[in-house]
Design a protein with these regions (language model features):
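Glycine- and other small-residue-rich loops at beta-strand/loop junctions that grip anionic moieties
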Residues: 1-3
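Conserved active-site-proximal phosphate/metal-binding subdomains
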Residues: 5-145
């Protein structure tokens, strides 16, 4: 799910037959989002290679921004740590990021598109900009037929 950061992604999804899109990370970094400003700032500063998937060994993969916690988690996974050891590491880590703003030990859930987000915007601005850009992309496709 997700993987959409802007109108280009929305247009591509629609041109492939989708009837809607899901945007998560983009709205986590919005002005209305209740996550801690440190979390939002990490998303805004992220580059395209700054996310990583943890939890593959447990069957519950989660994409997050790289930090000390994800490095430790991946190390433990590589060492075949059991579920309880991994669970112990992550217990409360989302709260640490969302409420406390702990960007070192918290889980900073974010999609691969984090690297495309450059500023904090209102939800209204995100939606209007995304729809306008999608309409422009779709209209431009019609001119290339």
């Amino acid at each position: 799910a997700g993987g959409i950061a802007d109108g280009r992604g929305m247009a591509a999804a629609f041109m492939l037959g989708a009837e809607g899109i899901q945007m998560g990370t983009r709205f986590v970094a919005s002005k209305e989002s209740i996550v801690h400003e440190n979390y939002k700032n990490q998303i805004i500063k992220a580059k395209d290679i700054d996310s990583v998937v943890t939890g593959m060994s447990t069957g519950h993969p989660v994409r997050s921004l790289r930090n000390q916690m994800t490095r430790e988690y991946l190390k433990l996974e590589k060492e075949n740590a059991d579920f309880m050891e991994l669970e112990k590491l992550t217990l409360g880590s989302l709260r640490k990021a969302v409420q406390d703003g702990d960007t070192v030990n918290g889980t900073l859930m974010a999609g691969q598109i984090a690297g495309l987000i450059r500023r904090e915007q209102t939800c209204r601005e995100i939606i209007e900009e995304t729809v306008q850009q999608a309409q422009e992309c779709i209209a431009a496709q019609g001119q290339h037929k």
